[in-house]
Amino acid sequence: MPLLDVTGLVKTYGSRRVVDGVDFEVDSGEIVGLLGPNGAGKTTSFRMTCGIIEPDAGKVVLGGLEVTRWPMYLRARDGGMGYLAQEQSVFRKLSVENNLLAVMEMLGMDRAARRKRCEGLLEQFDIKHIRRSKAMFISGGEKRRLEIARSLISNPKIILLDEPFTGIDPVTINNIQRIIRRLREDGIAILITDHREQETLAITDRSYVIRSGKVLCHGTADEVLNHPDARKYYFGDGPKLGDAA
């Protein structure tokens, strides 16, 4: 049984059905991409999976629990879901260290546990040298690493990443890709949606391409990049990028 099993998602706004029966799944220790052109329904599907939007129909099962109607905080607390928003979510006026400690305090961790966990995350994400810097003064890549570190505080089984490669330079993208691969090695499931399909496909085990509210195709990077309909409607008719994986 997959860790995350999404079946038959439907969402209608007015007379327009923006998501029409989307299914996908993610296993533990697997990186899965959710791709598609603007207006395809991928973002709505992703946000229904997170608990930001409630579906009109369909199911979201996380770790064997049906969480379809659960708000995001319950999915995080009781379902083992971590979430990285597209928009920067750091506390700008707090130091890097206090960004981590504040979340730990909200989760009810005792002082000794907070300190130990904080040191580990600062080391793991190479942000120890900026621990006392206010978040408003650190770089975009450092903010991204801090956000991912915060998403790991609750020891999630799965992390949902919304546009993790947006607004950062190529070197930082490579660093974030390495971090995501390490999370997979630790057995954490990853679901990514991003408009930068090449960077996403370079690290995914499988991807789903959404078009007109439905899954157009799914498979490995080679399989989706060489799928005739995916090339026609999304990737274009340029060179086949079969070495993206």
Where are these regions (language model features)?
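The feature captures the beta-strand-to-loop junction immediately N-terminal to the Walker
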Residues: 35-37
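Helix-to-loop junction immediately C-terminal to a conserved catalytic motif
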Residues: 50
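Conserved ABC ATPase "signature" region
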Residues: 65, 101, 112-130, 178-181
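ABC ATPase NBD coupling module
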Residues: 66-82, 87, 111-115, 224-228
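Short coil-to-helix segment of the ABC ATPase nucleotide-binding domain corresponding to the Q-loop/switch region
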Residues: 93-101
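Conserved ABC ATPase signature
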Residues: 134-138, 142
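Conserved catalytic motifs of ABC-family nucleotide-binding domains
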Residues: 155
